[in-house]
């Protein structure tokens, strides 16, 4: 049986964690990026489909390539972040299902319905992006997820000729707490949830 994590872990992962807009000049190693993926990949996806593909942009050249796609409000925070992850989804994720879900012919569920395949890929890559954020926090990193960018530009600049499509961007690094905004409220249980 699972045991609840410590209050300190809950604070790190959720209640005290913040979305960061400014960054300390501390690099994030490639080994740390591998550790992030090694954790996030275990989060559940539908039929273990694992549609997410990630490009970790760590270089000035990569950031300049990304720059034209960024909204003005996301420009500076992205250019100064040690890493920006392009979280994408593979529109042909089902080609890996014989490896990832060998219990039956799951591939045919999606090859027979392009709409189901697209919905599944997008929904599950969004879940995997959340796992990435939690994995970063668990390893002592901060994040700044963003949907304010030109997806078509990113797809053309980074994924042309492939089956990948961008979902969102996540800045990763060690946040500068002096640049945080005041904490915004969240909906209460009564406002967001129902009991039947």
Curated annotation (Swiss-Prot):
Cofactor(s) needed: FMN
UniProt catalytic activity: 3-hydroxypropanoate + NADP(+) = 3-oxopropanoate + NADPH + H(+)
UniProt KW Flavoprotein keyword: yes
E.C. numbers: 1.1.1.298
Induction note: Up-regulated by the nitrogen regulatory protein C (NtrC also called GlnG) and repressed by RutR.
Protein name: Probable malonic semialdehyde reductase RutE
Organism of provenance: Escherichia coli O6:H1 (strain CFT073 / ATCC 700928 / UPEC)
One example GO MF annotation: 3-hydroxypropionate dehydrogenase (NADP+) activity
GO biological process, one term: nitrogen utilization
Keywords per UniProt: Flavoprotein, FMN, NAD, NADP, Oxidoreductase
Superkingdom of this protein's organism: Bacteria
Taxonomy of the source species: Bacteria, Pseudomonadati, Pseudomonadota, Gammaproteobacteria, Enterobacterales
CDD domains the record matches: RutE-like (cd02148)
Gene: rutE
Annotated HAMAP family: Oxidoreductase_RutE_HadB
